[in-house]
Amino acid sequence: MIYPSPYPDVVIPETTVTTHVFGSTEESDTRTALIDGPTGATTSYGELAGAIRRAAGGLAARGFAKGDVLGIYSPNTVLYPIAFHGAAYAGGVVTTVNPHYTAGELASQLRDAGARFLVTTSACVEKAREAAEEAGGIEEIFSFDDAPGTTPFSALTDGAELAEGPQMNPSTDLVALPYSSGTTGGSKGVMLTHRNLVANMVQLDGSESLSRGLTEDDTVLAVLPFFHIYGLLVIMNWALSQRARIVVLPRFELETFLGAIQDHGVTYLHVVPPILLAMAKHPIVDQYDLSSLDAINSGAAPLGKELGLAVEERLDCIVGQGYGLTETSPVTHHGPNKRRGQCPHGSIGPSLPNTETQIVDVDSGAALGPGERGEVWIRGPQVMLGYLNRPDATAETLDEDGWLHTGDIGYIDENGYGYIVDRLKELIKYKGFQVAPAELEALLLSHPHIKDVAVVRSPDPEAGEVPKAFVVADGELSADDVMSFVAGKVAPHKKIRRVEFVDEIPKSPAGKILRRVLVEREEGRA
C-alpha cells in the first residue's frame, strides 16, 4: 500500500539553490538576515547576497569551477552561508564536516570527496592543517577568523563579484555532499543536487495549509549545526528563502540558548529531543522570558509523546516533530503545527507534498496497511542521487523504482499520520520478540527522576539479548525503581532487565544517541 501526501503536489522550479534562496536580492535590501548570537552584530539580506557573489568571484579567480568541492570544517557562524552559497554560486559542491572530527576523520572525508579548498576556524585549524596534509589535494585553507597560517576568508569577499555562475543542470549537478552512515554502516558521501534542496524547501512551503510556515516576521534560532543537513537546509536555507531573521549560535549551552530566545524574541525554534528534555525539566528555564516562542519543531531523533506534551504545557507553545534523513535532503514528513493538538504527540505527521511512503514487512517485503509496523520506504524529489563512489551501498538503499529504504521501523495510522518506532538495526531481539529502544526511552523520560536515558541490547545467554537502560538520574533512584516503573506499562518482552547509572549519555552533535558506544561496551563485558 502506497501512502500519498495529503497535500497537493507543488511545482519544483528548475533553478539552483542560490537563485532560489536569494533570487535577485539587491544590496539595498536592508532587512536583517543574520544575527551573530555572541556579539549581536547583524548582516542584512543585501549585504549577505553581495558577500556571496564576491565569495563566488574569489573562488572562481582561484580556478574553482563547476563540480569542484569546497569543505567547510567549522561550528556555526554568520559566515557559513557565505561560504556555502559562494561555492554553490560558482558551480561547486560543498562537503560539510563535523568540527568535532579528528584530523584522521576529516582527512578521510576530504580525500573521499575530492576537496580542493577548505574553510575552517582557529579552534579547528591545527586538525585542519594535519588533515589537509594527510588527505592531499587541498590547495588552500581559509579561516573565518584569520587563523595563523591560513588565508583569511575575507580574501574571498574583498574582490569583485561573480556576475553569473556557470550553466547548471539542477537535476544532476551536485551542490551538497554531507556524509552519513546511512542504512548500511560506514560514513558515505550523500550526493544531493540543486533540485533535491530546492524541492525540499518548496515542499516545506507547500505544507503550510496544515503547518505553520515561516515568514519574514519570524526570528529563528540556529543552534543545531549547519554541517548537519537539518541545520543546513531547514534552519539556514529555508529560513533565508522566507526572509526570516536567523540568530546564529556556535554551540548549545543552555543559558546562552535561553538568553538568545529572550533577547532576540525568537519565534520559531528547531531543536533535537535532548534540548527539549532540558526545556521540560531544567529549573533554570523559569528564569527566562520565552513568551515570544510560537512553534518548536523537533527532528533528528524520535520525540516521545510525553516529552513533547511537557514542553508544550510548560512554555505554552506548539511542539511538533518532523522526520527525514540526510539522504532525503532531509524532510519527508512534518507534523501539522498551526494550533496545539492538531497533530498527535509522538507522530511525525503526514508526508510532504510530492512524497510517497510505504511500510514494508522486513522479512517478506510485503506492503503493510495502517497500524502495521515495518520498514519505512520513501519516494520523492528530495531523495538523493546516491552515495558517492559507492554503487554497492546505493543499490542496497535505493531500489530501481526510486524507493529509498530508510532502515527505520514505523507505521502509518488510519489518518495517514506517520510514527517512527526505531532503527531496524537497533531493534533488540528478546527471545525472538522485537523491542524498540526508542519506545522504552520515551517511557522512561516521563519518570520525574530520570534526567536522560538510553536503552540498548545487552547480550544474555538465555534470551539472546535483553533491554538494558543507561540512566542519568535526577534524585534518588534505584535499578529496581527503574525496572518496576517500566514493567507495569509494557508487555513482558519489553521489560527493562538491566540498569546502569551513568553521568551522561553519549550523543552526536546532532543530538542522536550514540548507541554503538554503549553496545560495544556491553559486548565487551559479555
Which residue stretches match the model-derived regions?
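Conserved pre-ATP/AMP-binding loop-to-beta segment of ANL
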Residues: 14, 30, 160-179, 185-186, ...
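Conserved AMP-binding/adenylate-forming core of the ANL superfamily
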Residues: 30-77, 81-85, 102-107
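Gly/Ser/Thr-rich phosphate-binding loop
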Residues: 263-271, 280-343, 356
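Conserved AMP-binding A3 loop
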Residues: 42-46, 175-202
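Conserved structural elements of the adenylate-forming
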Residues: 49-57, 190-212, 223, 276-277, ...
